[in-house]
Each structure stands twice: as structure tokens, then as C-alpha cells.
């Protein structure tokens, strides 16, 4: 029987939110696309370090263990090509993350695939991609640095800041 997606929460996450791609992104910015591609392919067996959203994704996927069913699915959306994305998928396997669906967009913004994957939420570090997702009618959020480190407990916490009060300089 095919898996039904309408009875689960499907969250799309960008590869730069899931993993720390700052170093390789610097290569891209300073040396160009070919140097970036060579850099990623040469390191495809080296796991990437967890990114800003890694603890959140890990906890969301652990909900399935607690609930005894697949109630949450995380889908990866990436600007990487399939070749450079191999390092990302190898990192997913290294950390035993249950992520099996992905779109590698070859440099294009991945927001176009949100509806095709049946996602109800899109999380990214890229504010422009988040705006496009919102324009498509999908809930989306730009992830901001927590600067608080990784949480060691199993609690899952969200803070929504629709009017930019919580995370602005004016918050006291």
C-alpha cells in the first residue's frame, strides 16, 4: 500500500540550515562554482558538521520514535547539484537521520519543490527563499542563530516572532 502523506507533518529544510556549509560556501563565493564542486566532491566522504537546524530536525525525527509511527517527515531541499549534494546525503547517513526524499536544484532556489513534496512548513537560512515559500501559501520561517548551543534534552521548543519583537534589538 502506498504511503499517505496527508496524515503526517512534512517539513522541508534547506541543506545549509541542516549542515554547516559555511566553509564550502566561502569557496563558492571566492573561487566560483567549479572550485566549489571540486571541493565538495573531493570531500564527499567527510561528514559535514551539524548546522543551525540540526538539533531541531533531530528532535522532530525522534518524535516518530515516541509516537510509534511516522508522523513527521523531513525533506531536504538544496541548491546543490546531485554531484555536490552527495556529501550532504552522506552526512545524513552518517548522523542516521531518517531523511529519504530530497531535491537538488543545481544552483536554483529550492522553494519551487515545496508543494510537490506536500510540505506544510519550510525552514531555511535564506530569507528570500522563505518569502517565496510564503508567497506559495506554505508556512515558512527564516532560522536565526540561537548562539545558545545544542540542547541536550528531548524538549522541542519553538519561538514565533511575527512582529520581530523577540529577536530585535528592542527586545528587553
Regions found by a protein language model. Name each.
Residues 64, 137, 168-170:
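Generic short alpha-helical hydrophobic face used as a protein-protein interaction/packing hotspot
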Residues 2-4, 50-53, 68-70, 111-123, ...:
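Short, low-complexity cationic-aromatic patches
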Residues 20, 26-28, 41, 45, ...:
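A cross-kingdom feature marking solvent-exposed beta-strand/loop segments within repeated
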Amino acid at each position: 500500500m502506498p504511503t499517505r502523506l496527508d496524515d503526517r507533518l512534512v517539513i522541508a529544510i534547506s541543506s545549509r540550515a541542516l549542515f554547516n556549509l559555511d566553509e564550502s560556501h566561502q569557496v563558492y563565493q571566492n573561487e566560483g562554482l567549479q572550485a566549489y564542486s571540486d571541493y565538495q566532491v573531493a570531500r564527499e566522504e567527510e561528514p559535514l558538521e551539524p548546522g543551525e537546524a540540526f538539533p531541531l530536525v533531530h528532535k522532530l525525527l525522534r518524535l516518530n520514535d515516541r509516537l510509534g509511527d511516522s508522523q513527521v517527515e523531513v525533506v531536504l531541499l538544496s541548491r546543490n547539484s546531485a554531484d555536490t549534494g552527495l556529501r550532504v546525503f552522506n552526512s545524513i547517513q552518517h548522523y542516521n537521520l531518517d531523511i529519504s526524499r530530497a531535491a537538488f536544484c543545481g544552483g536554483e532556489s529550492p522553494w519551487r519543490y515545496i508543494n510537490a513534496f506536500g510540505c506544510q512548513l519550510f525552514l531555511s537560512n535564506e530569507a528570500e527563499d522563505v518569502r517565496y515559500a510564503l508567497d506559495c501559501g506554505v508556512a515558512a520561517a527564516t532560522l536565526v542563530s540561537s548562539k545558545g548551543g545544542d540542547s541536550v534534552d528531548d524538549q522541542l521548543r519553538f519561538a514565533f516572532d511575527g512582529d520581530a519583537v523577540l529577536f530585535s534589538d528592542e527586545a528587553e
